[in-house]
């Protein structure tokens, strides 16, 4: 009887922990979306948070995990949203692309530093992702043609300058930042689920006794 009672106690904790882990994931994704000005691609990155480890009867712990490299600014809100090529750069592209990382911040023009890095602009990569990059002023790149075999832009010295990705917080960093905000709610949720499971065990025990 005591052994069965012990196994039942372990099982109810296991269930409560796994349910809480799933709820924690939902809360973290929602909080990150509320804080960060991610676009559709950025929101998909946030949802890559998964439950890698589930609680079992031998290990009462669960683990959430995400494997993502650092995002570029193209995963956050920016205007315009399309990249411009060839003559469209002169005809349609604005003087500066604007972007923001936090929803609480205003859109900022990506003007560059005027010395080492050019203003920011959008480039469509072979994967189809539209990323935010800058040119390293005065540098020389060996990649002189585009993915489609077209000549790349050259500076006044005839050099094709190297492109540098404009970095921004990774999905991992964003989730780490929002965790302290959701932790109290997750703790309370776990307590409620443990109480719920306990009440179910008690109810079943009473039912068996008649």
Stretches found by the model and what they are:
Residues 1-11:
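Single conserved hydrophobic/aromatic residue that forms the stacking wall/gate
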Residues 49-210:
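Charged, low-complexity interaction tracts
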Residues 30-62:
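Translation machinery proteins
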Residues 9-32, 36, 178, 182-198:
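Long, contiguous amphipathic alpha-helices that act as assembly "spine/axial" helices in icosahedral shell
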């Amino acid at each position: 009887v005591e052994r069965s009672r012990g196994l039942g106690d372990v099982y109810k904790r296991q269930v409560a922990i796994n349910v809480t882990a799933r709820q924690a994931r939902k809360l973290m994704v929602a909080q990150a979306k509320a804080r960060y000005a991610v676009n559709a691609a950025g929101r998909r990155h946030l949802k890559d948070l998964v439950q890698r480890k589930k609680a079992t009867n031998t290990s009462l712990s669960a683990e959430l995990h995400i494997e993502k490299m650092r995002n570029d600014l193209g995963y956050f809100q920016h205007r315009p949203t399309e990249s411009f090529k060839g003559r469209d750069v002169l005809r349609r592209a604005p003087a500066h692309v604007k972007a923001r990382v936090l929803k609480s911040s205003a859109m900022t023009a990506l003007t560059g530093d005027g010395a080492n890095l050019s203003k920011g602009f959008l480039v469509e990569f072979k994967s189809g992702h539209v990323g935010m990059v800058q040119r390293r002023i005065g540098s020389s790149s060996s990649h002189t043609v585009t993915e489609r075999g077209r000549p790349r832009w050259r500076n006044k010295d005839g050099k094709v300058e190297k492109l540098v990705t404009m970095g921004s917080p990774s999905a991992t960093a964003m989730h780490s930042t929002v965790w302290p905000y959701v932790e109290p709610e997750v703790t309370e949720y776990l307590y409620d689920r443990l109480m719920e499971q306990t009440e179910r065990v008690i109810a079943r025990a009473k039912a068996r006794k008649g």
